[in-house]
From Swiss-Prot:
Keywords: Cell cycle, Cell division, Cell inner membrane, Cell membrane, Cell shape, Cell wall biogenesis/degradation, Glycosyltransferase, Membrane, Peptidoglycan synthesis, Transferase. Its EC number is 2.4.1.227. It catalyses: di-trans,octa-cis-undecaprenyl diphospho-N-acetyl-alpha-D-muramoyl-L-alanyl-D-glutamyl-meso-2,6-diaminopimeloyl-D-alanyl-D-alanine + UDP-N-acetyl-alpha-D-glucosamine = di-trans,octa-cis-undecaprenyl diphospho-[N-acetyl-alpha-D-glucosaminyl-(1->4)]-N-acetyl-alpha-D-muramoyl-L-alanyl-D-glutamyl-meso-2,6-diaminopimeloyl-D-alanyl-D-alanine + UDP + H(+). One of its GO terms (biological process) is regulation of cell shape. Disulfide bonds: none annotated. It is found in: Cell inner membrane. This is UDP-N-acetylglucosamine--N-acetylmuramyl-(pentapeptide) pyrophosphoryl-undecaprenol N-acetylglucosamine transferase. CDD domains: GT28_MurG. Belongs to the glycosyltransferase 28 family. MurG subfamily. It comes from Acinetobacter baumannii (strain SDF). One of its GO terms (molecular function) is undecaprenyldiphospho-muramoylpentapeptide beta-N-acetylglucosaminyltransferase activity. GO terms for cellular component: plasma membrane. Pfam families: Glyco_tran_28_C, Glyco_transf_28. Its main location: membrane.
Length: 365
């Protein structure tokens, strides 16, 4: 390496688009790269949520016009190669103009043309797959990437370039106190079990409709915090209207401080998106995962199995969420010692240093 190369800050182009599941881990890595003196730019789509999320992050955005090519429609399939080619050339133009040294792809439509562009220009590519089942774009890019990061073990075939890093998570989640201390403190104080239900920003109708009747059948004292989405507050509250005296219920449209919610929960009931599973493990909380049944390649079930297989969580498929099944499941779980053991196992399988790990791999390219 020449003196001029050593003095020039490394320029890393991030590629992540479409959903928070792709964008948030990439942003965590980008911010740490900036803290280490790297130049960071972002390859985005014109209409993706990444544009809004990056608005005040001091990261320049470069857009390429690309949409999903997976799906039906003859015209769409015929046009796809031309759209990919055009987007690839646009990405190449940006990379040459910016003198990009390394590219880090975190998924979304933008990563395909961006990864191909980097490969054609001889720029090293790192990809990061958040789910336990690789998405279409990352599965293709794994063949040409220099480094392949997986959040969950065995997502990709074993190889020298495959590294299990975990998913980058926010600092406030990694700073949560140990589950053993939290659960023991609540037990010694004689507090009721805290049940946290999280349906995501829009809420999960199946959770909102099926969980209240089942929870009302339980005989033990419970504090229930049910995040149901803005549009489903009244309907969810109505289902708890005749709750017995042993239940204290709060129905919330959204939760602003998830770190606090995790730290206070004895049991969380939620979907099994990659970042949710990662945060549950990092926080150290016993969980019941209800995988989204329409998730591509059923990847949420695969995500949930990461913790279920080590005794840190239970999986309840939405199709089996009958009152009888839920009652049996919850009756078993209303045991603080069991929940403590599950939470400790969850924390044992977390990778709280994922952000630093990925950043280190990028710096070495």
């Amino acid at each position: 390496m020449t003196d001029s190369q050593q003095s020039k800050p490394k320029h890393v182009m991030m590629m992540a688009a479409g959903t928070g599941g792709h964008v948030f881990p990439a942003l965590a890595v980008a911010k740490q790269l900036q803290q280490q003196g790297c130049q960071v730019s972002w390859l985005a789509t014109p209409i993706g949520m990444e544009n809004r999320l990056l608005k005040d992050q001091n990261i320049p955005i470069y857009q390429i016009d690309i949409q999903g090519v997976r799906g039906n429609g003859v015209i769409r399939k015929l046009a796809a190669p031309f759209k990919i080619l055009k987007a690839t050339f646009s990405a190449m133009r940006y990379m040459k103009q910016l003198k990009v040294d390394a590219v880090a792809g975190f998924g979304g439509y933008v990563a395909g043309p961006g990864g191909l562009a980097a490969r054609l220009l001889g720029i090293p590519v790192l990809i990061h797959e958040q789910n336990a089942v690789a998405g279409f774009t990352n599965a293709q890019l794994s063949r040409v990437a220099k480094v392949v990061c997986e959040a969950f073990p065995n997502t990709f075939p074993a190889s020298e370039k495959v590294v299990t890093t975990g998913n980058p998570v926010r600092r406030e989640i990694t700073d949560i106190l140990s589950p053993k201390w939290r659960y023991d403190e609540r037990e010694q104080a004689g507090k009721p079990l805290n049940i946290l239900i999280v349906g995501g920003s829009l809420g999960a109708k199946a959770l909102n409709e099926r969980l209240p009747p089942a929870l009302k059948q339980l005989q033990v004292p419970l504090n229930i915090f049910h995040q149901c989405g803005q549009q489903q507050v009244e309907a969810t509250q109505a289902l708890y209207a005749d709750a017995p005296a042993n239940l204290t219920v709060q129905v919330l449209p959204f939760i602003e401080d998830m770190a606090k919610a995790y730290s206070e929960a004895d049991l969380i009931i939620c979907r099994a998106g990659a970042l949710t599973v990662t945060e549950v493990a990092t926080a150290g909380v016993a969980a019941v995962f209800v995988p989204l049944p329409i998730a591509v390649d059923d990847h949420q079930t695969a995500n949930a199995k990461f913790l279920a297989d080590v005794g840190a969580a239970k999986i309840c498929q939405q199709s089996t969420m009958t009152p009888e099944v839920l009652n049996q499941l919850f009756t078993t779980l209303m045991n603080r010692q069991l929940l403590t053991e599950m939470a400790v196992k969850a924390r044992q399988h977390a990778q709280p240093n994922a952000t630093q790990h990925v950043v280190g791999l990028i710096q070495k390219m």
